[in-house]
Design a protein with these regions (language model features):
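Small-molecule pocket liners
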Residues: 18, 44, 83-86, 91, ...
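Paired acidic/hydrophobic, glycine-rich loop segments that form the ligand-binding mouth/hinge
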Residues: 19, 65-69, 84-87, 177-179
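Hinge/capping helix and adjacent helix->loop/strand transition within the periplasmic-binding protein
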Residues: 1-54, 103-108, 117-150
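A local structural motif
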Residues: 16-19, 38-51, 55-65, 155-160, ...
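An extracytoplasmic/periplasmic, membrane-proximal ligand-sensing/linker region
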Residues: 38-42, 79, 105, 128-189
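Ligand-binding "clamshell"
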Residues: 42-43, 77-88, 95-108, 180
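Short helices/loops that flank or line small-molecule/ion binding pockets
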Residues: 11, 35-39, 53-67, 72-80, ...
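Beta->alpha turn/N-cap motifs
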Residues: 52, 69-74, 89-91, 116, ...
Length: 189
């Protein structure tokens, strides 16, 4: 909670003085920060880059004050002491940064399910029995210890699901991000 109140207080004390990087307009990083701004009252200006590398370079160099990024991509910079992780999204702490509290632990529950996810998709007319068989096969592979370990090392959390659960997640994310885009008046470049 300390970091949030300090950030918000600083942004109120000097309006327009704080900024944040993202790898581009409308990216998950951009939307996550807009959701955080809305939930916390933070006043910060978006600085969109053409990709993650420029955003990270300017964060490390101090040209921007903050950004959302994956723990995995920020880890080399945190280990060198050039970047400090302030909070993680998700319902539990990151295995790669167990000492960093979640947003929820710091009083911002709206960031709980802000995370990147990967899914395997098939064409809409794929037969249901084939979808179910492929899903079972993918779950079997994802539950193998060596696969879990490799993905965890890359900062991912293995959460296999059913096609129906994926459909629910997609609908829920679309509704949440549509509201963020509308409220923040984000327009396509």
């Amino acid at each position: 909670m300390l970091f949030r109140s300090a950030l918000v207080a600083q942004s109120k004390r000097s309006p327009g003085s704080m900024n944040y990087a993202s790898p581009g307009n409308g990216t998950p990083h951009h939307l996550a920060m807009e959701l955080f701004k809305s939930a916390s009252g933070l006043d910060a200006t978006h600085v969109p880059y053409k990709g993650i590398q420029g955003a990270l370079t300017d964060l490390v160099g101090g040209q921007v004050q903050m950004m959302f990024g994956t723990v995995h991509s920020l880890k080399p910079h945190t280990q060198s002491g050039r970047v400090r992780l302030l909070a993680t999204t998700g319902t539990s702490r990151s295995a790669q940064a167990p000492d960093v509290p979640t947003f929820k632990e710091q009083g911002i529950a709206v960031m709980d399910h802000v995370d990147a996810w990967y899914a395997v998709m098939a064409p809409a007319r794929t037969p249901s029995d084939l979808i179910q068989r492929l899903n079972r096969d993918f779950i079997e592979v994802m539950n193998q210890d060596d696969v879990k370990a490799a993905l965890t090392q890359q900062g991912m959390v293995v959460r296999p699901s059913t096609p129906e659960q994926l459909g629910t997640l997609i609908k829920s994310d679309l509704a949440r991000w549509k509201k963020v885009v509308t409220d923040a008046r984000i327009a396509a470049d």
